[in-house]
Amino acid sequence: MDYQTIEETAAKWGITSRQVRTYCAKGRIAGATFDGKAWLIPANAIKPERKSRAMPPQKSILAILEAERAAKLTGGIYHRLQIDFAYNSNHIEGSRLTHDQTRWIFETRTVGEVGADMPIDDIVETANHFRAVDTIIATAKAALTENYIKRLHAILKGGTTDSRKDWFAVGDYKRLENTVGDMDTAKPAKVKAEMARLLAWYGKTAHTFEDVAAFHAKFEAIHPFQDGNGRVGRLVMFKECLKHGITPFIVTEQMRRFYYMGLHEWQGRLQSPTRLLDTFRAGQDAFSAMLRHYGHTVAADAADARDGR
């Protein structure tokens, strides 16, 4: 069977790539498959009929997570999110914990099944990530401020070996210079001003999916903390998606290469957002599929509405 890309199908049907991606994620294109990186669509696929705009009220993703967390529900989307998010975000940064070990820590609040040679920070930061996600669910509607971002860093790095180093500021901006690969980041003396400028810019945006992604690229370029910038940055994106009704996403280990390439391309000379946005959209597709797996149908986000989905 011959297959087409999202872009080829969009051109053929006269709609946006985002609409085609949504049709795929919602299972509305027969034979469409996701290979872990992109959707493959049969060349003879039929364009789905537009649905009526009259839809019953639906719960937001934030409301679902709040309810499942409050009920201490196991085996639901909240449970799955906590494990998958902590495992992938920490693993991207070098954690040695497996997915099963991460699940064990979340479900039992013990380390009984974790090997004796496992770095203690991998365990502590995993437990801290669970707390950070709980904090975000409880405070998602709060304004995004410097203090809020610092609070996430304090939660993530609290009790780690870094927290006992004189030069490491837990919950505060870096004191020493750091780099990301071959790219320079903001000097410690300039971080506060750079963060204030970033938040002022973001506050004037429409807080769309693209704005959240742009904030992340700019935040990672500043790299305001001594360590933990990637994880804090991804937590911030999660919070802002929940706040503004945008389908959230998890950057998985499988997406790692495309994620870092996307950041580099956006932050570099060409300032191209395409790869990073596509990577995040693939994550949204996976999250939407996970929601359907657990029987949830949620209200479309603002970007979906603009595309007429």
Which role does the model predict for each range below?
Residues 38-39:
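Short, basic, alpha-helical segments at the C-terminal edge of helix-turn-helix-like DNA-binding modules
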